[in-house]
Amino acid sequence: MLEAQLDWGLALAILVGFGILWVAFGWYLGRDNRSIDDYALAGRNVGFAFATATAMATWITSNTTLVAPQLAYQFGIWGMIGYSMAAFGLMLFAPMAQRIKSLMPHGFTSGDFIRTRYGKSAWAMFMIISVFYAMGWLVSLGMAGGILLSSLSDLSYHTGMSAILIICVLYTLLGGLKAVIATDFVQSILILTGVVIIAWVCIDTVGIGEIHQSVSDFQPELLNVAFPAAIMFLFNNIFFGIGEIFHSNVWWSRAFAFKTGVGKRAFLLGGLLWLPIPIVTGFIALAAISLGILPPSADMVGPLVAAKLLGSIGAVFVFVVVFSALASSMDSLLAATSDLITQDGYKRLINPKADSDTLLKASKRVVIGLGVLTWLLCLPKVATLGALLNFTGAFVASAIWPIVFGLYHQGLTGRFATAAMALGTITGLVLYFVIGFYVAAISACLMSLAVCLMGLLFAPGKFDWQTFKEPDNVPE
């Protein structure tokens, strides 16, 4: 165990204190939730400051705080720069958020859009992609909580994993999206402050020159700008990040929840604020060589370096910052996935006549169910965080072009949209296993684009945008 690690008593006290604080905050914010609109979309009245904070904080996930250092440790400079390219997803979604709000001012989920625009077959394929990705992301966040706690203290992986799941499920259950967005605002301030302080201490204590020399001596390939696997990862991650945001109900629910005119500015600024964070967290990981840290697993390198640099007090600080980052994503994902399952699953397939109160109760039950299922899937810890997240890249990247063409072009039909998502996913998964995780997303995206272009060229349709305004397609 490192000297900088926390003893189990202090770690447990922080965990309990943190949990009580967030759960109480969630209860306080959720007291006035009276309808499914209040619970799922925060009354569709979120302003610019909170909108920007939740966009940035939600994207600062286990990926940014644990996987970005892991990839810098494995791929060097292209690892951290490549991860920062995921900011393009947020920035490119900015004009799309405005388009979504104008087309579907009363929409609830991304599934609403796909079903109305392309029909039931495409909707079914899209739901498979969305639910699979959501579970992959939830499991990665649960695993990250366990990895964080076991890296910084004597507490086990299973204790940390269980704790973050229980805390996030409780305050999401009590407060809904309103609590999620408000806690994101606080968490974004903690995260930004923490990342800056840790980076400054790293530069002051170790020094850029010493870090460069150590990497040059012991792992020179990490500084090689022509490192083939790292270059492939760079381009793959751009499309992975875009696919994650374009398809996910986490971001669509925010487009619906933000005030009219806010979404475009909020997503653009959120992306710009997020852009440097993976570079900073990745840079910290390169100091592991100078500090003589050999992490038992590559995804533990970030917390171990930060704790070593900052000492015992720093370990507390690192714990709070990374835990905030994980919570800010898990609560958003729980809320958005429960909306998707409630609206597109329960209401559409099981109880079409469900009123607002019934949907509100169903949504809360789904949040609990998602928490339990995620806990069960996290128990074995079957992969590293990087491998788990990138496995879902084939799924999400295949949905990029059907969504873009669906929003801006009348010609793409449901048959070709379905084929694009299915063939794109299959191609990405095959190449994931044949070549590696760093080609899954880009290959899925290219195959999906080829199918979409074939549809536009050989069998174009003419979708009527007014279909979104018809009574059957406007949620009650």
Task: Indicate residue ranges for each PLM-predicted region.
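Membrane-embedded helix-loop-helix hairpins and adjacent transmembrane boundary segments
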Residues: 1-476
